[in-house]
């Protein structure tokens, strides 16, 4: 029985919160069940639909794993490596954690072939690894992983908002609600919270303008 691993991330670009890299393993036969459930790229689904889809995906999957990389970890790692290399390490961790004959990744590098090669090297897994741009639209196993990762990311933002009692927006630098939250937090506390990526230019600019 051929086992195929799909891997995708959610939260690479936000200034607020963790990044999540999800891996899900399916047999070739399971792909028919995924298709019957209507699995597609997470960006094409509403948050409610993603959550209901998550339960179906996990009930079909042979194995799954979600790696969380916190804002603090990203800041620390960026002092010694590029964001591309962080993506390689995170995807490698997921690939090495799960058992499959083949892995398909959504490429997190402009050079998809180089990304696959680096993940293969770092993971140390002797399996076939394919990385493609927009793999979540081309391969249903990657679409499934994108849903799992996105739900984990959405859930973490909701949990943060509940703990703080205030809206964070999407967490992306382009979101006015996110920028407003950061400005208000700096005004009130004089610094940025631990769940913000302080190495992001948006965070640095807002912090500098408050001095």
From Swiss-Prot:
Transmembrane segments: none annotated. It comes from the Archaea. GO terms for biological process: DNA replication, removal of RNA primer; mismatch repair. It catalyses: Endonucleolytic cleavage to 5'-phosphomonoester. A divalent metal cation binds at residues 8-9, 106. Residues 2-211 form the RNase H type-2 domain. Pfam families: RNase_HII (PF01351). GO terms for cellular component: cytoplasm; ribonuclease H2 complex. Keywords: Cytoplasm, Endonuclease, Hydrolase, Manganese, Metal-binding, Nuclease. It is found in: Cytoplasm. Its cofactor is Mn(2+); Mg(2+). The keyword Nuclease applies. The keyword Transferase does not apply. Manganese or magnesium. Binds 1 divalent metal ion per monomer in the absence of substrate. May bind a second metal ion after substrate binding. InterPro entries: RNase_H2_suA, RNase_HII/HIII, RNase_HII/HIII_dom, RNase_HII_arc, RNase_HII_hlx-loop-hlx_cap_dom, RNaseH-like_sf, RNaseH_sf. Its EC number is 3.1.26.4. One of its GO terms (molecular function) is manganese ion binding. NCBIfam families: ribonuclease HII. Belongs to the RNase HII family. Endonuclease that specifically degrades the RNA of RNA-DNA hybrids. This is Ribonuclease HII. It comes from Methanothrix thermoacetophila (strain DSM 6194 / JCM 14653 / NBRC 101360 / PT). The lineage of its organism: Archaea, Methanobacteriati, Methanobacteriota, Stenosarchaea group, Methanomicrobia. The gene is rnhB.
């Amino acid at each position: 029985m051929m086992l195929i691993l799909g891997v995708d991330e959610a939260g690479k670009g936000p200034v607020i919160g963790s990044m999540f890299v999800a891996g899900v393993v399916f047999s070739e036969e399971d792909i028919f069940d995924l298709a019957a459930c209507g699995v597609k790229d997470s960006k094409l689904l509403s948050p409610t639909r993603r959550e209901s889809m998550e339960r179906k995906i996990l009930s079909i999957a042979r194995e799954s794993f979600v790696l969380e990389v916190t804002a603090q970890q990203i800041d620390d790692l960026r002092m010694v490596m590029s964001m591309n290399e962080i993506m390689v390490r995170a995807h490698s961790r997921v690939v090495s954690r799960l058992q499959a004959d083949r892995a398909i990744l959504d490429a997190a590098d402009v050079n998809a072939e180089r990304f696959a090669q680096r993940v293969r090297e770092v993971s140390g897994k002797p399996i076939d690894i394919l990385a493609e741009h927009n793999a979540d639209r081309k391969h249903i196993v990657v679409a499934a992983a994108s849903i799992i990762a996105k739900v984990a990311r959405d859930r973490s933002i909701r949990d943060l908002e509940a703990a703080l009692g205030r809206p964070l927006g999407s967490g992306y630098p382009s979101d006015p609600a996110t920028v407003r939250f950061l400005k208000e937090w700096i005004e009130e506390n004089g610094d940025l919270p631990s769940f913000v990526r302080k190495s992001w230019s948006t965070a640095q600019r807002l912090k500098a303008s408050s001095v």
